[in-house]
């Protein structure tokens, strides 16, 4: 469990809520599945090593990115910068790059590369070394 904004979140509860929200989005759009709006999964490496708050932020970054179209392969480079979590979110086609600096409260800074891949039936978040 991680403390974020003075609230304690349970990993399993967060994942169930995220899946429920995605299901609602699919129903709202008449069952039509849009890129990254299908079932979502995280690999063991992500679940064990990437703080849940960062997992949720990365899913949200994919959901809210303003591009003409989303590439099936999203890249997140996470590092530490001046005591804060730095996240560089990018995709290849169409070209997209956005940098974020986040001050985390109670969650450790994660350093590494994470991919989010959509294969039209589900979306998976995995560490680069699990690819």
Listing of model-derived features with the role each one plays in the protein:
Residues 2-103:
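N-terminal "domain-start" segment
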Residues 94-131:
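Short, compact, well-ordered microdomains
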